Curated annotation (Swiss-Prot):
Species of provenance: Salmonella typhimurium (strain LT2 / SGSC1412 / ATCC 700720)
Keywords: ATP-binding, Chaperone, Cytoplasm, Nucleotide-binding, Stress response
Subunit comment: Homodimer.
Keyword Chaperone appears in the UniProt entry: yes
Protein name: Chaperone protein HtpG
Domain of life from the UniProt record: Bacteria
Amino acid sequence: MKGQETRGFQSEVKQLLHLMIHSLYSNKEIFLRELISNASDAADKLRFRALSNPDLYEGDGELRVRVSFDKDKRTLTIADNGVGMNRDEVIDHLGTIAKSGTKSFLESMGSDQAKDSQLIGQFGVGFYSAFIVADKVTVRTRAAGDKPENGVFWESAGEGEYTVADITKNDRGTEITLHLREGEDEFLDDWRVRSIISKYSDHIALPVEIEKREEKDGETVISWEKINKAQALWTRNKSEIKDDEYNEFYKHIAHDFTDPLTWSHNRVEGKQEYTSLLYIPSQAPWDLWNRDHKHGLKLYVQRVFIMDDAEQFMPNYLRFVRGLIDSNDLPLNVSREILQDSTVTRNLRSALTKRVLQMLEKLAKDDAEKYQTFWKQFGLVLKEGPAEDHANQEAIAKLLRFASTHTDSSAQTVSLEDYVSRMKEGQEKIYYITADSYAAAKNSPHLELLRKKGIEVLLLSDRIDEWMMNYLTEFDGKAFQSVAKADESIEKLADEVDENAKEAEKALEPFVERVKTLLGDRVKDVRLTHRLTDTPAIVTTDADEMSTQMAKLFAAAGQSVPEVKYIFELNPDHVLVKRTADTKDEAQFKEWVELLLDQALFAERGTLEDPNQFIRRMNQLLVS
């Protein structure tokens, strides 16, 4: 063969092949689904390119995929007359994985085969799945519009290398031949192959045909029998489509091995005409947080495939949604640039966003357990919503879930509607605290009075929470209030102070002034508080002051952070505060005040500028 060369696989491909053969073997029949799915994609791409260049059809516009096998040679062949590939494309698509972050992801995978098989499925392993059942795979392909002599041959045993060469191929498209391993004879059985295709590929809009051989007059006559419905699933009536068909179609378009959590299939007529089929996955893709992660919907215009990953139809905080939209209002020659500035696109985006939020609301209402699965996988992404989509903020807020003092669990199961339904008589605000961890939030001294009064506090410990709460200012007419900020509504919750206590506090005014003088501009203010029950002192910030958690976010992002000026609040009923107030020796007084401030700062920030000084001071006071 001309131009023959042997090349090594990209290292990630070798790792993926090894993991896949071992992890997916228990579900090995999916290789046929994957290869037929790829053939369908190749047909979609040809249809799209032929819109502007009909000559690409080369006189054969009836697109199909054909499956045949040879029992003597023990081969199974899947052939399509789709867009095909040239030599460079063969090397790019069959020798490398073009996903950033793949290497580190593969290295992190463990020995949990069930989990591994789900994660591997997210790569859209497609072609490589052939090696689950084959010890050698041969590919013959030619790109649509190329000369017959520009065909390409590719072959590999799925180990370290592959061979590529030039061949003559008269018909366009791709033909993949699997040389089956010993023990895989089931895939040479006509009935078995038919049943797999019916199970996994009935929804494919492309006709899938299987070879029929009949003996007539001593000769073998070959014909092709269509064995799938070959009608685009989303164009069919919802009442005719089974759940299994929706599930398999999801796996086809999302290249996922797991069933989706839920879906919504809608046909809209009137001002705008479109069909949408939207899915919520049951598992986050491994690269969801990767900057290069591709997301978006498949776009069809009048049932003609236009593009994958059309992100213009979904806001970023819903980037986990998979599915498609088939519009009658967009032009067939639409580009990503046209989509960006199109009124039709904006209207579709608005309608589809509402549809997804309604779908999630229904899931939360009908199946709390499934919704918890969704929340664990995608809750952090949904939390971007309040900042990104003010118009739908109330709908997004209903979908948020939090840990809370009511449940006494780190599980984020409490909705804002739950919280409001449990608010105490006269309670006007929704109280929350942000912290680095659930434990830090739960044990914060800021909660002491609220706990005593039985008032629920939402415990927020995800990094995004502080940023989200800057935009989420109210729900159901109730304002959100951080308990780490100075607020009169919290002070009002304290028990009425009797006259004797008032006199005692009045007597402490010189003490407060003495502390102010000592600390100077290191704090914004010093005051007595009734919001503490067990703790001697805390620090809080004013409503307009940057919070501790926000300062940490800025610092983690490498941005300059203005110094947070705290209000130093002292518990007049605490023995340590009383002892400090009674201390006459100035040096000793200073040590006590510094210790109380350091304790408060440590509880608030989790760190101290000089922890050794704090330890020295504490040890000294313990023995004094």
